[in-house]
Amino acid sequence: MAALEEKASQVAEWLKKIFGDHPIPQYEMNARTTEILYHLSERNRVRDRDVNLVIEDLRQKASEYESEAKRLEDFLMESVNFSPANLSNTGSRFLNALVDSAIALEIKDTSLASFIPAVNDLTSDLFRTKSKSEEIKLELGKLEKNLTATLVLEKCLREDLKKADVHLSAERAKAEGRLQNMDFLKAKAAEFRFGIRAAEEQLSSRGMDASLSHRSLVALSDKLSELKQQTIPLKKKLESYLDLMPNPSLAQVKIEEAKRELDAIEAELTKKVDMMEL
């Protein structure tokens, strides 16, 4: 976090230096944009440093050329009694242009052998500079595209985050409602259990048969279902007796016994059911 704040501070100083008195364009401050602008400021700082070094070198060479020009001028004056002041305006312009060209090309003299290699080197430097400039433009274009894509992605993520917060709030409200309902149901269940226990105690104090309690009735209901299931094979067995032909009187006796047994079971079940309904 400290490193990011330091980079943001350097970026702010660099932008203030670049725009001067003009207002700095608004941009969204985040880690991604800060990192991109920081790298641009570093490259700009390195470029400014290199330019300053070149300027200092050119100043030094200009001073050397001026000294050399003064020496040559003195030499000409001593050798052939020649002075630049004796030249015509055109000659003076040519001479100044020749000197300026020699200074610009950083050559030791104004001979053709010095001028041609210097011009070739300057042409090569020009092509290299143009190529480097194109590379920088392409890189800046990529950075701009990446920055735009990053900003769009960040916007989408912020919108998704807002939607997630809204959904989470709704789910939290639902969960709280369910918890409240659960607490209410628990309280009601406890209230019902207490009421049942109190009613059972009251009925017990009045001499009620324990077999008629809610728990016993539930058990009897289960037993009733079980007995009903048990009557199914008895009914099937009874139907098989109806098909017996060898001894009709004996079969009739068996049938009557089965009917009585079945009627007794159904009567018992009916009695239990009636007691449960009461």
Curated annotation (Swiss-Prot):
Keyword annotations: Cell cycle, Cell division, Coiled coil, Cytoplasm, Cytoskeleton, Microtubule, Mitosis
Disulfide bonds: none
Keyword Transmembrane helix: no
Keyword Cell cycle carried by entry: yes
Family classification: Belongs to the HAUS1 family.
Protein's name in the database: HAUS augmin-like complex subunit 1
Gene coding for it: Haus1
Subunit structure as annotated in this protein's UniProt entry: Component of the HAUS augmin-like complex. The complex interacts with the gamma-tubulin ring complex and this interaction is required for spindle assembly. Associates with microtubules. The interaction with microtubules is strong during mitosis, while it is weak or absent during interphase. It is unclear whether this interaction is direct or indirect. Interacts with EML3 (phosphorylated form).
Gene Ontology CC terms: centrosome; cytosol; HAUS complex; mitotic spindle microtubule; spindle pole
Organism the protein comes from: Rattus norvegicus
GO biological process: cell division; centrosome cycle; spindle assembly
Biological function: Contributes to mitotic spindle assembly, maintenance of centrosome integrity and completion of cytokinesis as part of the HAUS augmin-like complex.
Localization per record: Cytoplasm; Cytoplasm, Cytoskeleton, Microtubule organizing center, Centrosome; Cytoplasm, Cytoskeleton, Spindle; Cytoplasm, Cytoskeleton, Spindle pole
Coiled-coil residue windows: 128-150, 248-278
